[in-house]
Amino acid sequence: VTDEAVGAHSDAAVHGSATTGLRVSGPDEAFLLAEEKLGFRTPIQFCWVLDDDPGLEAIERYAESLSTGLLHRAISRRRFPAARRRWVSSRVQPRIIVGARIDDAEIGAWADNLLRSADLRPAQGLGWRVHTTTTTRGRRVVVLLLSHLIADGEAIMRALVAAADGETTALADPDTARGARALAEDARDSARQIRSAARSVRAVARDARQRRRERREGTAPVVPNRPPSPPPTYDPYRATLAIVDVDRDLWHAQARQYGGTGNTLFTALVCGLVRRSGYPVGDQMRVSVAVSKRGGPEDLRANASGGIWLRVGEPQESPADLDYLRGLSRQAFAEYAKTGTD
C-alpha cells in the first residue's frame, strides 16, 4: 500500500458514522481520468435470476439499503490546484428501473443490452443503478449496474453484504468539502502532491540518465526486432459478451483433477479463449491477475487493488496440467509480496 493510499483512508471512521478526508487517489484517479479525458467508462454488472419472486417491494428495500452504504458516493469539485478530489456521499436518489416482462430465453440478451447501454455518471453521484423485470415463467431478474470508479470487486461484495445485513456506513456530507477548514486541508494536500510529483520527476530523470549511460557503454539490453502483428480480423471496438452457467462443484472438481485451483482453471480458460480467438499475443501472453490491498472495515477506499502479471508461454510449454500456471502464480505473488510493484 502506498503512502498516498494510506493517507486516503487513515482518517476514515468505522461502520455507522460519517467519514471525512477520504480522497480520490490511486486507481480511482486512473478510472476518473479515463472517463473525463478519454470517455472510457468501466461498468460492472451483477445479474441475479430468482426462481421465487420476492416482489418489487423487496428489490426497492434492498436498493434503499444500498443507498446508505459506500456505493452511494460522489466526487466533490477540486477547490485548490493539484489537490486530490474528495469522496462524499451522493445526494442522488437511488434509481430502480422496472422493465417489461421478458421471455426466459431473453434474459441474457436483456442483461447484455443493459450493460452496453449503461449511462452511469459516478463523479456526479449516479454511480450505480438497479434494473429489474420478471419472466414468462414467473422468475424475477435483478441487475445491478455500477461503475468501477466507485468500487472494486471486494468493495462491491462488502457493500452487498452490508446492505443485506442492514449496516450503514455514510461518507461525508458534500457540505464538508466546503468552508475554510476544507480549503486549508486541500492546500496541505496540494503541497503533498506537488512534492510527490517532484520526487517522481527526479526518479524519471535518474532512470533516463542510467539508460543513456548504458547505451554509451554498450551494456543496454538488446531488444530483438519482432515482425509486425497481423491486422485484427474482428472489430476491436465491440466487446463480445457471453453468459455461461457452470456448476460450482464440477468446476472445482475439474480444477483439482488437473492439479490446480478454481482460480488457475479460470486463468487457463481465459488463456485458451484468447489463443483460439486468433488475437495476436506474441511469444508470451501477458495475463493480469488482481490482488486486493484492502484492509479491514475501516478501509473505505473505492478501489484498493493491485495486480501481478503472468507471462504464459506457447501451449506446448503449458500442458493441461495446471501446475504450470500455479508455479507462475506462486513466483509472481512472491515477487509482489517483496516489491509491491503492480
What are these regions (language model features)?
Residues 30-31:
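Nucleic acid-processing catalytic cores of prokaryotic defense/repair systems
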Residues 4-22, 48-56, 61-68, 75-342:
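Soluble acyl-CoA-dependent acyltransferase catalytic core bearing the H(X)4D motif
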Residues 41-46:
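Generic N-terminal amphipathic, Lys/Arg-enriched alpha-helix
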